[in-house]
Regions:
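Nucleotide-activated sugar donor-binding and catalytic core shared by glycosyltransferases
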Residues: 1-228, 236-342
Length: 342
């Protein structure tokens, strides 16, 4: 068998779907590179659906979320550490087996550790430079983990951050990474049979967003508007809901976002970036205690408490004008990656 030049392993964190969706956007701009994805859960399902090469081998710990509040952060952190050790073994096997010449990681630190040990060029895509899950006595474990994370980051050939800002040392900030569509908004609305004002409720790749689905449906029905409610539940929620059209688990959320008139979503970065890029008004409610989502939603002017004023927000946002923002983060990321290929 002839070995493909530039064979590259792309380790994409399977915690939620935001990592893999931005990674797909990047790989769409890397046609000459033979890319093998390594991930798990819903992320692997999306890649299989889109017919990418994928090793479905990662099994991430799940967040315990009750009524929108993240519980047992310390336990989650401990489980994450065990998961990380397990991923190190898995990634080592894959990297050696594939004779990888380049490792790209979207917040999968295990594969970077191995790549750095084996002196293989390695690129990190991340929007988190430190975690802030725990307080008090357990936070010393997290501080220790952050320290080793910072070490890994420092040793990467390049770190790509999908936000606007300055480049420092090996860190390149390139702006949001968003999937492109080849259709106009009108074509998409026709394709999805959206005939009325359309409100999309989207909760990502975990079951953590159940609280938001229920609260949102209740608020919309209370307002008694002539709208269609579209639900995208991801791979983890199987509960049935009335008065909505449930699209379940999709691989083209960006197109549904573009076709919608309002998006109500958890505060994952990739969804927020896609909503902003396509100019659809959005309401972003974070999981309480999830530092990353709380930061993301704060940047957009929301907080967890907004869950109690959804009716008012929905009316305001349905009146808001669309404001499309051009982003080229995916192309810029691809350009950076190409420099590491022969």
């Amino acid at each position: 068998m002839i070995k493909t030049m530039n064979n590259c392993d792309f380790f994409s964190s399977p915690i939620g779907l935001g990592h893999v969706t931005r990674d797909i956007a990047i790989v769409n701009n890397l046609k000459d590179l033979s890319v093998n994805f390594v991930t798990g859960s819903g992320a692997a399902q999306i890649l299989k659906k889109l017919e990418y090469n994928v090793d479905d081998v990662y099994n991430p710990p799940s967040f315990v979320v009750e009524n929108g509040v993240l519980n047992n952060q310390a336990k989650w952190l401990w489980n994450y550490y065990q998961y990380y050790k397990n991923c190190k073994n898995i990634s080592k096997k894959i990297i050696k087996q594939n004779n990888s010449e380049l490792i790209i990681s979207d917040e999968d630190f295990a594969s970077l550790t191995i790549a750095q040990e084996l002196k293989i060029p390695n690129i990190l895509i991340t929007d988190v430079l430190e975690t802030k899950f725990t307080k008090g006595i357990t936070s010393f474990i997290e501080k220790k983990m952050n320290k080793s994370m910072m070490n890994i980051i420092k040793n990467c050939d390049v770190v790509i951050i999908p936000e606007d800002g300055e480049n420092i040392d090996n860190i390149k900030r390139i702006g949001p990474i968003v999937r492109k569509t080849n259709y106009s908004r009108e074509e998409l609305r026709k394709k999805f049979s959206f005939n009325k004002k359309t409100i999309l409720i989207s909760v990502g790749g975990t079951s953590a967003g159940l609280f938001l689905i229920q609260k949102s449906i209740t608020a919309i029905l209370k307002l008694n508007l002539d709208v269609e409610i579209i639900l995208v539940t991801g791979p983890s929620i199987t509960k049935e809901f009335e008065n909505v059209r449930n699209l379940g688990f999709v691989d083209n959320l960006h197109e549904i976002i573009y076709a919608s008139d309002l998006v109500i979503s958890l505060a994952g970065k990739s969804t927020i970036d896609e909503v902003n890029a396509y100019g659809t008004p959005g309401i972003f409610i974070p999981i309480k205690g999830h530092f990353e989502q709380e930061d993301n939603s704060k940047n957009e002017g929301f907080s967890f408490e907004d869950i109690n004023r959804l009716e008012k927000l929905i009316l305001e946002k349905l009146d808001e004008k669309r404001n499309k923002i051009n982003t080229n983060g995916a192309e810029l990321a691809a350009e950076i990656i190409k420099k590491f290929t022969k």
